[in-house]
């Protein structure tokens, strides 16, 4: 990659796989019945590569192995500066000082944007190569704090394309007739977390497009989701607006999802698809706490060592094995 890319600097970044994480449930599902290895050494043929990579421990061993090999092959890279971020460290393959790139981010998603900010101090064009929608929206939401032109490269071979974040902002202005595209970009990040991502459940049958359209036609909702996650705590005013937003998402001008649930139930005489009703207010509060927490982590992407509060207070409960599970209602 480094030899084929026409770039002066390339940063390669990896996830960190922690034992107690809100991402563990998703990872455990991928790891069930998969291959586990004890050591990665050179000269071994890996026959079940997808099974190998489904296990977080395997990934970390492979990453460390690759980095150790890359360090011995730096001469073939030429003048390109290559930095590699893994665990809580970052190394430069050519021996440059990269202490200011040390960080404790768990996900490569946030680390990519953290590095983009660093790169923007010396380069006016930054290309983030990723297929992940989370990264695009984190970069879009924080683009106002990053100098230079931010581009997202996604897809491979003939399907590869480069997306300009500035063009997305201009499109938001035109399509939704809004003036402040930075505010709308921040709102899209907040809404993305609220409507579902790797760690947060989604609203069945609602997708992403309808929530975006609902938000963009009301400045109250744009401001709500632009501020969503600035602090990990959810205020009562925010939750009141969230209830109104969710009611509208389900086609009702109400302020309480419990009332909407009853209205739909009564209109259908009890015969209804569970997907057609919003969550009750108690469950919605727990969902909102989790989403606010996740968006807060994204917003902190530009900090090397962000202070993130305990997960337990924000809609998750920690079970005996240390994993986190979503709470559906407040503990009595």
Predicted regions and their residues:
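Noncatalytic, typically N-terminal accessory segments of nucleic acid-processing enzymes
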Residues: 1-332
